[in-house]
């Protein structure tokens, strides 16, 4: 989800880069913040979007599931007083922190931030040795729990679907053999095994562990489910004329956002396998191009922007539809609750 997946963000000299909001101008153009408007930033992070929205005169409710981000954002809370509210929460719960039908805009920047990648103790990066954690908050199941406890069949599904890893069976079986001798504890521990069983080829542009680390992070934080629930919640929270803007960095996430807006356009759909559904009242209309990506100039300055895609929709007066997760066709993956038992 980042320019150097699993490996941290670096500048030309190899040092960590400061967090730069991706597609900021495009986000603001789609969101149209202005005095008197109430915007929810579902992924506060380092506050890049929130700062720009506040500068445009709007009021902001910002959410983040990472307590580190909440602590770092207290200076912004003090600086902006009543115009800015910062809440420790997953963005799938945005309805708990905003008036139903009262928001003028919602912006979601999906994925792990460069700051989280650069903190070795968070366990997101295989290039920085640390505990095999990957949780965006301190709660729930860690990546080590998944690797050491999940059935081989579940590991294969997780790596294949969430990481699009073609060597998923080989890696999963190697994990099973190794954990029987000694459990996995660190990022380098797991990355080393993956590199051993699937060595990098000359033509490979990424580290062999990249896709597995991505899959584990998405699974541990239920990132796809969180995104889907956030889209449904935003639909109910936005007033007519309100704007929903989502920035994604991975094909799976973009597919979810694209499917959501396509479904909410209200057009009839069907296939040779399914009956044609009748047209429904659209709850969202398109804003500008169906998808916006970063310019070469931005990607050169901020490599993380290279894979970014922005999609946006304008809320209509039609009533919000039911939150039906079957819309996205998620496979049946292992239960986080059982792994954490």
Swiss-Prot record:
GO terms for cellular component: cytoplasm. It is found in: Cytoplasm. The keyword Methyltransferase applies. Its EC number is 2.1.1.199. The keyword Calcium does not apply. Gene3D superfamilies: Putative methyltransferase TM0872, insert domain, Vaccinia Virus protein VP39. S-adenosyl-L-methionine binds at residues 47-49, 64, 91, 109, 116. Keywords: Cytoplasm, Methyltransferase, rRNA processing, S-adenosyl-L-methionine, Transferase. GO terms for biological process: rRNA base methylation. It comes from the Bacteria. It catalyses: cytidine(1402) in 16S rRNA + S-adenosyl-L-methionine = N(4)-methylcytidine(1402) in 16S rRNA + S-adenosyl-L-homocysteine + H(+). One of its GO terms (molecular function) is rRNA (cytosine-N4-)-methyltransferase activity. Specifically methylates the N4 position of cytidine in position 1402 (C1402) of 16S rRNA. NCBIfam families: 16S rRNA (cytosine(1402)-N(4))-methyltransferase RsmH. Belongs to the methyltransferase superfamily. RsmH family. This is Ribosomal RNA small subunit methyltransferase H. It comes from Rhizobium leguminosarum bv. trifolii (strain WSM1325).
